[in-house]
């Protein structure tokens, strides 16, 4: 099955990336550092290799979290927190300089954008697992993934319509990641138990505030992120898309329909957890976040590809391929309600099947699209030289 049609191949040759970053932290602090840091890499180093190396830092971080806190509810050694912070900082740095390396080597391409943003989509899951071990979030780790996935999906959706990736003054890739790796370093000093305290104990400034002072610190951070980061960002995305759709006399309902695969994915997993007799997310947080994160990566990848290739036809239907496993999982969990709490198939095996399904689907998509784009543009994924005509 091919993912790119003849029209898409022609569109790839015309495509030009457009992005704007309004972050003051990036402009005055990080950009000068990144401009110098990119010179560490030799000119023969392909940008996609830098992207992949950065992504592997987060994979390593999540593995450390799993080894020392399998259910993300026990404190790992303090050096693990420091490692989480360092690996996230390196991921952010490598993710920022891959584009600079592409411009240095005159090797910018639509494949680079897809590869970069595709890794970023998966990074939401792997960093959520790493932070879950730092803050001992347990089942709340899934919600920390959700609050990173929603703005990412919203930004991708906005980019699809505006043709420009707009990062506001305070954004996730810059200030958000910086705040998280600082949190990792901070935890290496005070210990993971700090996050398990009530907010009034961990931050005495809030001790006088009724109700708020009794909330667990990690959960209070989750609520604050939703209120002050996720909701404003989503409102920003919707406003920008509405302006574009209105200027084109288009349908906002059809634009919003592109969000439903993600809503169904999120809702399906939550219903599965509700029906499951084993408290699914709390028992196997890594597997739930991994499987759902890969399904999310497929959704984002399909939307980015449709944008690059100007091929929106059938987009929503194709995106729903990542949802095909959920009806089976829900039906199996429902059998437990009808059979004295015992499902037809053990939930662990169903969850492992979910991860295998999403891994297979994503790998098929990624490898197929990389092959199709490299053939269409006459380039290599991990080499700077062009293919001979």
Curated annotation (Swiss-Prot):
Xref: Gene3D superfamilies: 1.20.120.1760
Keywords: Lipid biosynthesis, Lipid metabolism, Magnesium, Manganese, Membrane, Metal-binding, Phospholipid biosynthesis, Phospholipid metabolism, Transferase, Transmembrane, Transmembrane helix
Top-level taxon of origin: Eukaryota
Catalysis: reaction(s): CDP-ethanolamine + a 1,2-diacyl-sn-glycerol = a 1,2-diacyl-sn-glycero-3-phosphoethanolamine + CMP + H(+); CDP-choline + a 1,2-diacyl-sn-glycerol = a 1,2-diacyl-sn-glycero-3-phosphocholine + CMP + H(+)
Protein species of origin: Arabidopsis thaliana
UniProt record, GO biological process: phosphatidylethanolamine biosynthetic process
Topological relation to the membrane, as annotated: Multi-pass membrane protein
Any one of the GO CC terms: Golgi apparatus
Pathway: Phospholipid metabolism; phosphatidylethanolamine biosynthesis; phosphatidylethanolamine from ethanolamine: step 3/3; Phospholipid metabolism; phosphatidylcholine biosynthesis; phosphatidylcholine from phosphocholine: step 2/2
Transmembrane segments: 40-60, 141-161, 176-196, 221-241, 252-272, 280-300, 322-344, 350-370
Name listed for the protein in its UniProt record: Choline/ethanolaminephosphotransferase 1
Binding locations of Mg(2+) 2: 95, 116, 120
GO-annotated molecular function: diacylglycerol cholinephosphotransferase activity; ethanolaminephosphotransferase activity; metal ion binding
Site residues by UniProt (Increases basicity of active site His): 113
Places the protein is found: Membrane
Chain sites annotated for binding Mg(2+) 1: 95, 98, 116
First-listed, main subcellular location of the protein, grouped into a coarse class: membrane
């Amino acid at each position: 099955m091919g993912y790119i049609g003849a029209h898409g191949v022609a569109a790839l040759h015309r495509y030009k990336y457009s992005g704007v970053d309004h972050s003051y932290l990036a402009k005055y602090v990080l950009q000068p550092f990144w401009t110098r840091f990119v010179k560490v890499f030799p000119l023969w180093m392909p940008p996609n290799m830098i992207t992949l190396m950065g992504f592997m830092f987060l994979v390593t971080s999540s593995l450390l979290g799993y080894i020392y806190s399998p259910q993300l509810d026990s404190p790992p050694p303090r050096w693990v927190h420091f490692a989480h912070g360092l690996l996230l900082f390196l991921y952010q740095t490598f993710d920022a300089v891959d584009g600079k390396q592409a411009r240095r080597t005159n090797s910018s391409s639509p494949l680079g954008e897809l590869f970069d943003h595709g890794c970023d989509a998966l990074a939401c899951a792997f960093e959520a697992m790493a932070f879950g071990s730092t803050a001992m979030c347990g089942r709340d780790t899934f919600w920390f993934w959700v609050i990173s996935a929603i703005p990412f999906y919203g930004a991708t959706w906005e980019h699809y319509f505006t043709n420009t990736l707009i990062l506001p003054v305070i954004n996730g890739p810059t200030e958000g990641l910086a705040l998280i790796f600082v949190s990792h370093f901070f935890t290496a000093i005070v210990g993971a138990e700090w996050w398990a305290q009530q907010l009034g104990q961990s931050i005495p400034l809030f001790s006088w505030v009724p109700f708020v002072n009794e909330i667990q610190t990690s959960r209070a951070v989750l609520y604050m992120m939703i209120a002050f980061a996720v909701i404003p960002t989503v409102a920003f995305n919707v406003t920008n898309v509405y302006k574009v759709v209105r200027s084109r006399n288009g349908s906002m309902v059809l634009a919003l329909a592109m969000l439903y695969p993600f809503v169904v994915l999120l809702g399906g997993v939550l219903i599965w957890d509700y029906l499951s007799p084993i408290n699914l997310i709390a028992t196997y947080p890594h597997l739930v976040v991994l499987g759902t994160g890969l399904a999310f990566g497929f959704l984002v990848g399909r939307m980015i590809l449709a944008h690059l290739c100007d091929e929106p036809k059938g987009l929503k239907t194709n995106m729903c391929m990542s949802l095909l496993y959920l009806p089976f999982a829900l039906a199996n969990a429902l059998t437990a309600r009808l059979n004295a709490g015992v499902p037809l198939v053990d939930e662990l095996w169903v969850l492992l099947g979910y991860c295998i399904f999403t891994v297979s689907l994503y790998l098929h998509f990624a490898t197929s699209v990389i092959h199709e784009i490299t053939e269409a543009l006459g380039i290599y994924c991990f080499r700077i030289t062009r293919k001979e005509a």
